[in-house]
C-alpha cells in the first residue's frame, strides 16, 4: 500500500525505506557510467534493481485499467455524481476524421478511463502519484495498442521513468 511520497509498504515485510537503490544520485553521474560501460539507461536499472516480472504486472494492470474504464458509462461514487466520460470520448475519437484530433481524443479517453477507474475504487497503478494515475496508463495503452510498440520497449521506458522518479525523489 502507498504511504505517500512515492513510497510503498508491503504488509508483513520489512521496510526498505531510505535505502538507496542506485549507487549514483545525479543524472550526470548515471549518464557517465552508462557511457563508460556502453549501456542504455534501462540496462543500468536492470543492473541495480532487477524488476523481473514486476514491470510486466505493472504494465498489465495499466492496460487492464484503461480497458475496464472504456467499458463503463455509470456515475462515479461520491456526492458529486460525476458521469464517466471515457467511453464517450473514445467513441468520438473513433468517429474523428482528423488524425491529430483523433490522437488527442484517444489520449484523453485513456487518461480519463484510468482516472475514472481510480475514482471508482478499481485497482489502478498510482504512479507517479494517485492524482496523476491516468497519465502513465494512458501513454502505455496508446503506445502499445495504437502505435504498436512492443511490451519490451514499453517495459524499458517504464524502468527509465522509474529511474528519473527515483532521482527526483
Give residue spans per PLM region.
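Mobile "lid/hinge" segments at catalytic clefts and subdomain interfaces of large enzymes
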Residues: 1-53, 57
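Accessory "access/gating" subregions that flank catalytic or transport cores
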Residues: 49, 53, 57-167
Amino acid at each position: 500500500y502507498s504511504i505517500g511520497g512515492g513510497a510503498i509498504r508491503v504488509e508483513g515485510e520489512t521496510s526498505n525505506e531510505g535505502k538507496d537503490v542506485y549507487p549514483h544520485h545525479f543524472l550526470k553521474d548515471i549518464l557517465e557510467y552508462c557511457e563508460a560501460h556502453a549501456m542504455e539507461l534501462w540496462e543500468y536499472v536492470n543492473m541495480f534493481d532487477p524488476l523481473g516480472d514486476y514491470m510486466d504486472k505493472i504494465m498489465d494492470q495499466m492496460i487492464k485499467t484503461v480497458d475496464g474504464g472504456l467499458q463503463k458509462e455509470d456515475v462515479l461514487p461520491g456526492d458529486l455524481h460525476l458521469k464517466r466520460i471515457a467511453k464517450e470520448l473514445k467513441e468520438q475519437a473513433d468517429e474523428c476524421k482528423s488524425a491529430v484530433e483523433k490522437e488527442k481524443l484517444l489520449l484523453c479517453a485513456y487518461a480519463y478511463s484510468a482516472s475514472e477507474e481510480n475514482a471508482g475504487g478499481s485497482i489502478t497503478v498510482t504512479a507517479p502519484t494517485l492524482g496523476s494515475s491516468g497519465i502513465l496508463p494512458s501513454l502505455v495503452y496508446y503506445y502499445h495498442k495504437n502505435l504498436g510498440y512492443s511490451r519490451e520497449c514499453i517495459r524499458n521506458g517504464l524502468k527509465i521513468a522509474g529511474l528519473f522518479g527515483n532521482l527526483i525523489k
